[in-house]
Swiss-Prot record:
SMART domains per record: CBS (SM00116)
Domain of life: Eukaryota
Bias type Basic and acidic residues, positions: 493-505
Protein name according to UniProt: Protein SDS23
Biased composition (Low complexity): 15-40, 481-490
Function text: Involved in DNA replication and cell separation.
GO biological process: cellular response to glucose starvation; regulation of mitotic metaphase/anaphase transition
Keywords carried by this UniProt record: CBS domain, Cytoplasm, Nucleus, Repeat
Organism: Yarrowia lipolytica (strain CLIB 122 / E 150) (Yeast)
Lineage: Eukaryota, Fungi, Dikarya, Ascomycota, Saccharomycotina
Protein family per UniProt: Belongs to the SDS23 family.
Amino acid sequence: MDKENASVEKAPTTPSLAVPAPSQASPQSPQAALSPSNSSIQATFARARKGSHASQMERPNNRDFAIPASPTVGESSIAELVTAPPAVTPSRSRSSSAASNNQAAMSPVFPAYDDSNAKHYRRWEDDRLDLMVQPDKLVFVEGDTPVEKAFDKLVENHFTSLPVRTAPEHKSVSHSFDYADLNAYLLLVMGYVDAADTTPEALENVKKARSGQPVPVNFVAGLGAKDPFICVPRDSTLATAVEILGSGVHRFAVTEGPASDAVIGILSQRRTVRYIWENGRLFKTLEPLFQTPLTDLGLAQPNPNVLTIGGDEYVIAALRKMNAQNVSSLAVVDASNNLLGNISVVDVRLVSKSSQSHLLKATCAHFLSVILNARGLEDGKDSFPVFHVTPQTSYGRTIAKMVATNAHRLWVVQPDVPSPQPSTPSGQPASKTHGPSHHAAHNGKLIGVVSLTDILNVLGRHAGNSDLDPHFARRNRRRSSSSSVRSRSSYEQFRRSISIDRGQR
């Protein structure tokens, strides 16, 4: 099972945080970009503030535009083979993340359900949430912890999110710290955004941040609008989780129960989808859904509003766009809207040191090679992750790709139709020259997107919750103020807010 801060998703490792100053240096090789730096965060902050005005980072020079070479045949197929969940076992014990990913990547076909295992089948809706969290792996961060130490804790534990508590002796939580907050903080230090909170304390923290002084993670976690921190007791079921997460909420806390608000785990969209996959053979009622193409579920419709970033645009532009739109990843496309790759908010870790400042002015296309190289160095993976699906990809295979790539969303592409090859004088097709080519030649033209919210929303509607709205949480975040970051909410309050939202539409 993946580490989900006790259910918070696993993230790649990276050196300690140091907000970089923009540099005029040309992009280095991916290996050089990942070299360690001795520059401290305090020393770097002051440099980051200087010369970082937005006007300096609007568009890259043509010499910076370098699309990484496409992977060879076989490298791009790591997730194409992902089709079948792990085999049925009577035990509900948790499997390791590495074993699960390997199983997902190597399963060649989606096998039929075996009625000899009927005694092990169960309704997915009835599984309790305490089966899905690991209290012994839960890691907190105190609100007064300096942000750089909180970032180190994210890295050390391979998490993408940490619950924030007011004091070590407290186990109740009202909000979290994640890579989206880190991105907002980097942009704040560099002067691209301002804090919504204008209280004297907040303004003092902004001043400290821009002068290179430590600021508490509690302040950084409040820089952007978030979902109210929903708390659900441990004896609640997976049906409740799908209702919450299928409405667009990214994660919620699992607590001891009505008599105690002590948090025992954080359940995210990614962990929930992984759990569905790992136990898929036990949920026989999901077999028809797993086999259904995305287009039949309404998940692959052409969407002209998919958020993208041009391959020739700066990395800093991608970070700003993800922050402004409150999304966790962007599709990188060429001038013809062909999919080149994917940039995630977690990739902000690769520009968190002063030695990496040149990457802020690198093109997004070049940055894709840096991301790929980091994946290879950290995980030993020499393959290009497949972040795309087609309208005919099945629901089950889409889930499998999300599990294999740890992606929050997959891009829907219209595959390229190969043109007929001219024949040689002998009547045989001409041999194909194998050389570097753009990723678009393999990925196809971008037409839409499928997110974890979409996957869980379909699951909820499949279970009979026809009113489940995948856009509820996004609307709620847009209406929220910075004070909502620290608000707690019970499941009952969540249901009431949904009813109010329906009445306003």
